[in-house]
């Protein structure tokens, strides 16, 4: 249980950092979705990779926007967290949103692997020719894990909320502390309330590790494919930096960035849930929450830099902003 009051300097630092992350996430994911949708309207068709990127950007845009809405709700209605229905509804919403965010990113890695990797295996070629169906099957199969996750969370929520209601002395004297703990613990919003959270950790970690493992396998297979391709180029005495090699490298950069950010996210999720004694130090708590929000927000800029169309669109926006700034300076605004 938490027993100390929040230091206002820590709370101020936490709030400023989180607001910057939220604004950055809204701009980043909103930009990806806007560029792809405008291109879709212009060309009247959209590629498979752009479909995945757009769905991923919209999912994370909603996630980041919901964080801002929840902050405003808790500021305007500080007694809102006492309602068990609100706890359950927000928990389910963030689980669903986080689920599709992670699995769509996994689908992106699998898509790059099947499109770029070169293997003569008949099963791989079968999947390569049916990459759209493979992605659809992955999404549909992930719904099974989503259902199990929601059911597990629902069962656990009943015990956690009951424990919270039965121990009103825990946070009724300091609702601000409960609000921040509840609000920014990602899809595990009630784990920091009771000391029994370590019981639920293996179940929650399982749902998190499944897409991570799939992405890791795709990443390793891409490395193996690049190694084979590089050896083939050496035998044929061709330039190592051919089109296929560059495609491998770009795909590896995209998948690796996801794995790195996701590994950091999982690390701090485990720290936040498992080491409850450590989390009594408010500095560690703040750092844990901020680190958890970095993953879905910072990944948008990795996607922009890794996609030629998005990168060119971002470069075209920057000169416009500079020109607008110069015009405003000229007008004395």
From Swiss-Prot:
Membrane topology annotation: Multi-pass membrane protein
GO molecular function, a single term: bitter taste receptor activity
GO biological process, alphabetically ordered: detection of chemical stimulus involved in sensory perception of bitter taste
Entry annotated with the keyword Hydrolase: no
InterPro entries to which the protein is assigned, alphabetical: GPCR_Rhodpsn_7TM, TAS2R
Cytoplasmic side of membrane: 35-60, 112-134, 227-253, 303-333
Tissues where the protein occurs: Expressed in subsets of taste receptor cells of the tongue and palate epithelium and exclusively in gustducin-positive cells. Expressed in the duodenum, antrum and fundus (part of the stomach).
Residues in compartment: Extracellular: 1-13, 82-90, 156-205, 275-281
Residues modified by glycosylation: 7, 167, 186, 195
Transmembrane segments: 14-34, 61-81, 91-111, 135-155, 206-226, 254-274, 282-302
Principal location listed in the UniProt entry: membrane
Compartments, as annotated in UniProt: Membrane
PROSITE patterns reported for this sequence: G_PROTEIN_RECEP_F1_2
Keywords: G-protein coupled receptor, Glycoprotein, Membrane, Receptor, Sensory transduction, Taste, Transducer, Transmembrane, Transmembrane helix
Superkingdom of source: Eukaryota
Entry's Gene Ontology cellular component terms: membrane
Family: Belongs to the G-protein coupled receptor T2R family.
Stated role: Gustducin-coupled receptor implicated in the perception of bitter compounds in the oral cavity and the gastrointestinal tract. Signals through PLCB2 and the calcium-regulated cation channel TRPM5.
Miscellaneous section: Several bitter taste receptors are expressed in a single taste receptor cell.
The name this protein goes by in its record: Taste receptor type 2 member 123
